[in-house]
């Protein structure tokens, strides 16, 4: 089930305002250009910010998200008719044969179960064309980002279409590799809504192994330009079945 900040209509409507500027998306747009992708699958597209940016440039985009409330916000935006919107989770992606797939923000970290993560990776691979590229980010556990997720460091009042909203974050549990936290939203009418989340902080080597097991070739691991030293950006290529079989033979022969 998607977290309330995506699934509850009142929270989905203010999501973009709370998030503010998205410099992280500039990097994804540059990678789309780097690989010359003309079709993109946005997994966990949320309110469609990146999908709409790419579609405005003539790129064929499919935006997939499990939260209908977030997709409703995306569909209400100018240019939304250029994007194909699909309500689905990461393990049941449409077979669009995309040139490139992305998972921005914390999307890759919400799949906390190993089997679930493996299913998502296989689903992404199945949605890509042969040699298609997948790009996603994951936080570096050693940087302990959750230590900054507390009220005194995150509190702000944000102007939204719902009026001013008080916002802050509190961590509720740390049992690595899992971190749980709650985001608070206090509206001008006094309503206090909460969205509870759980993320898995996988180390880089564990992620790399999971990618190989799912049939990807690791092309690069980059520093996230908007959070240098704090996040890894993984760039991988979907292997053909013949390549996977060849790799399996090599492993057995070692």
Q: Language-model features: where?
A:
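C-terminal lobe and adjacent flexible extensions of AdoMet/dcAdoMet transferase-like proteins
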Residues: 202-254
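A short acidic, Gly/Pro-enriched loop at the edge of an enzyme's catalytic core
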Residues: 93-100
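A short glycine-rich, Lys/Arg-flanked "PGG" loop and its adjoining helix->strand segment in the class I
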Residues: 118-130
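Conserved class I S-adenosyl-L-methionine
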Residues: 1-36, 38-44
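Class I SAM-dependent methyltransferase SAM/SAH-binding core
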Residues: 48-92
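A conserved beta-strand element that flanks and buttresses the S-adenosyl-L-methionine
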Residues: 102-104
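SAM-dependent methyltransferase
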Residues: 135-208
């Amino acid at each position: 089930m998607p977290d309330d900040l995506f699934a509850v209509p009142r929270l989905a409507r203010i999501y973009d305002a709370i998030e503010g500027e998205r410099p992280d998306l500039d990097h994804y747009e540059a990678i789309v250009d780097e690989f010359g992708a003309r079709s993109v699958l946005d997994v966990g597209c949320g309110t469609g910010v990146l999908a709409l940016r790419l579609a405005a440039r003539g790129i064929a985009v499919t935006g997939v998200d499990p939260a209908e409330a977030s997709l409703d916000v995306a569909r209400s935006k100018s240019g939304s008719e250029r994007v194909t919107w699909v309500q689905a989770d990461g393990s049941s992606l449409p077979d669009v044969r995309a040139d490139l797939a992305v998972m921005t923000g914390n999307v890759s970290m919400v799949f906390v179960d190993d089997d679930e993560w493996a299913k998502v990776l296989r689903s992404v691979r199945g949605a890509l064309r042969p040699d298609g590229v997948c790009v996603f980010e994951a936080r570096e556990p050693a940087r302990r980002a959750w230590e900054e997720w507390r009220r005194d460091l995150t509190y702000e009042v944000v102007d939204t279409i719902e009026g001013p909203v008080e916002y802050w974050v509190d961590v509720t549990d740390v049992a690595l590799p899992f971190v749980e936290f709650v985001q608070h939203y206090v509206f001008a009418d006094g309503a206090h809504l909460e969205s509870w989340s759980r993320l898995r902080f996988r180390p880089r080597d564990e992620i790399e192994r999971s990618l190989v097991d799912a049939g990807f070739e690791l092309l690069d691991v980059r520093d996230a330009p908007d959070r240098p030293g704090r996040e890894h950006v993984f760039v991988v290529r979907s292997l053909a079945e013949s390549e996977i079989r060849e790799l399996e033979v090599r492993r057995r022969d070692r």
